[in-house]
């Protein structure tokens, strides 16, 4: 017999009755039923009920066991007594009558229980992550993550992609966030950087004659903590292709992402034939560039119905050309209580309020706005929005660039409050035609809005002849249920166009050469047209596992203060290590 086990804790069935077997695992739960001891023994594969009565030679040993002790149990498989089957367990028809117990690893008092799914403070869960990972839901999430990554790999290979690994130690580059820097011992005063993404390397692969690349790539960004992003590191499905247009990238990747979602959707519908939404339309209709299309609400510009109207607040705003009035339809929201609740919510978001119109039976509009603009304009708004009796509409006004974020939040709030969001689907879409540049209010300059390596629509002619803020890029995102899950673009593969694109954003040619020397040199020796994307593995797994917390799908995540409480990172290093790196600390006084 094997030293530790003949079967796993999820393997035994009623076909094994009367066999003598050996199991090893953790004591998941121990119950004393009037002298009869039940031990639920758990391993990675499942759970088996083990039982000892006072006649068992192992009864005294069984009495000493405690939760999460690791034990080896020998015994005889028998049918559970009539009426005690557990249909929730694959092993639920049998139990193991214990004949021998060996303690392999006792456990101290537990800082958090493994049995059950009780909520515990996050810091406790992260400090004792090895216990947390034994809990059923988190353990299953990690296994699902592995299966999703396997599915991604398989589907990428079916599409003709080849997997390569790019370097982890690389050069620092301005890709939008701070780099994690690694000092060089051999080259005093110089630093490597951990890659924010394999962007330059994957483009260099295309210039090296490879055609279709992918990898599950670790990425590192020294960013301030955010609720929707783990500090430090994340993983992406990184992709690049040669001799492709934007449509070619879509044709290659849409089946991969759709297929992965269908594999793990657990009965939810998955969009087929994704819509392609221009960035400007997404912002106007949904108030965001990552729309949740499960929410049917689409906002509309209704400025014409308030221009010159009796509602002077909006009418005066509209005298300035840049200002607009947008309507947020609220199907079924035509009650005074709901409209007042939305108004209070808006005030809690720092707004002066949220104007509204309700429609009564017969189509009559009600509320302060309706009273001020009159029945004709009120009816025109109702018709434009496709609303009926019992519905409402909410209004935001001013400069859209200032109110668009709030309008998007209001659309989401209305959808949630009125139960309009279809929770039984994964609504996937492409968002396309992103602006190449944006105006940076902090630095008072034009800057890249997304990836600086994207091809401008119109190429060099656009860079030379257009207002930079009107140039669109061959740049695209994939969105799902309100999350951006992938981003990509067709690359700017001509060196003169690359230099001009960076010049517009305030980078001189020498800085481009210094920062991106390897790629810039490669452009001089025949660079193919190429493009690609990167999909966020963590976010995709989070959506498919049905959680809204990235820590619930990550093995050993940091907390929101970018600390690894289990390993004690970041940590101090010895003076000797600092001397070897020629580093002297200059710590803040406080």
From Swiss-Prot:
GO biological process, one term: aspartyl-tRNA aminoacylation
Binding-site residues, ATP: 221-223, 484, 536-539
Record-level GO cellular component terms: cytoplasm
Keywords per UniProt: Aminoacyl-tRNA synthetase, ATP-binding, Cytoplasm, Ligase, Nucleotide-binding, Protein biosynthesis
InterPro entries with a match to the protein in the record: Aa-tRNA-synt_II, aa-tRNA-synth_II, aa-tRNA-synth_II/BPL/LPL, Asp-tRNA-ligase_1, Asp-tRNA-ligase_1_N, Asp/Asn-tRNA-synth_IIb, AspRS_core, GAD-like_sf
Reactions the enzyme catalyzes: tRNA(Asx) + L-aspartate + ATP = L-aspartyl-tRNA(Asx) + AMP + diphosphate
Keyword hit for Magnesium: no
Record-stated family: Belongs to the class-II aminoacyl-tRNA synthetase family. Type 1 subfamily.
Subunit note: Homodimer.
Protein's recorded name: Aspartate--tRNA(Asp/Asn) ligase
